Amino acid sequence: MTSAVHLTFSYLKRTLLFRFEAGTSRGVLHTRDVFWIKVHRMGDVDQVGWGEAAPLNGLSPDFLPDFEEVLGRLLVQANHRSWDMEEESLLQQVKALVPFSLPSIRFGLETALLDFLNGGRKRILANTFFDQGAPIPINGLIWMGTKEFMLQQINQKLGEGFTCLKMKIGAIDFAQELELLRYIREQEAAKNLVLRVDANGAFSIQEAMGKLELLKDFGMHSIEQPIAVGQWKAMRELAVKSPIPIALDEELIGKIDKEEVLNSIQPQYLILKPSLLGGILETREWIQLAEKLGIGWWMTSALESAIGLNAISQLTSTYLPSLPQGLGTGKLYDNNLESPLVVQFGEIQYNQEGIWETPS
């Protein structure tokens, strides 16, 4: 039986600055607010756990005008309770304290507590990524933008040795997007490239199948969210008839009854974003159900800083993934934290000799 302890919780806010105009289906991003959760024993800051709560505008259920006040109130409650210091127990305690409707706070609190439990070294879970420096294969992301900007990114990612590219589509003329995909396939470096596209729900139900037929010629691995969320019957029909495997992404956010979603649509893949789904415990439940139903999956970060990306990478590593994951590179922001996370040759790795910058 582990002993319960009282801990001190607080947070720091930083506005991260994008290095470029980050085009998404919900507009162009220039900045991103993150809240780093800090936990330690009262009067002892030698051992500190850090987590990240950073809701995304237009995607996170907890992107709220009073988010900072909500976070502050929950941390006051966390200060006034005792914590049973065991991994599974901590996850259950966070679930009991933080409502399902606040997924980024759940994720941040889970991460901070597990980091503290493991000595405040940024080790969240037992995993080969942190413990042995084992790399995780990732996809190179091609952001939405002008055709010229997307072409520039394609050449850069191929030059960096990525073996899997994911291109966001639905922002520019579809014919131009097809030209870009054709260009990728014509490159010598892309002969065996795994190619994914993410439509972010951009296709109408009426046009979706026609566009999928045009995309199939490029040897697609999968397409994420071809139509908008909430159209389960139409999405199920696409999952049955599409020449390209369907992956659900936004469709999973805010869903308590996981089995209902998956049985209704029966997709080929799931895209799992822990900070949007409710953290480690919720993500593990999605994976357990997906594997029971024979549905593939991969993990994806959601523009987190190095604190969040580190936690998601470690969670991913516990499953020893073979598919390329959608983990970020940590190079999105001018003022991200310095960290041991490095990306080279299409893999993310934890440099065990690297140094962490302390959040401030």
Predicted segments, located by residue:
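Alpha-helix C-terminal capping segments
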Residues: 117, 317-318
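Short, solvent-exposed secondary-structure boundary motifs
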Residues: 28, 329-334
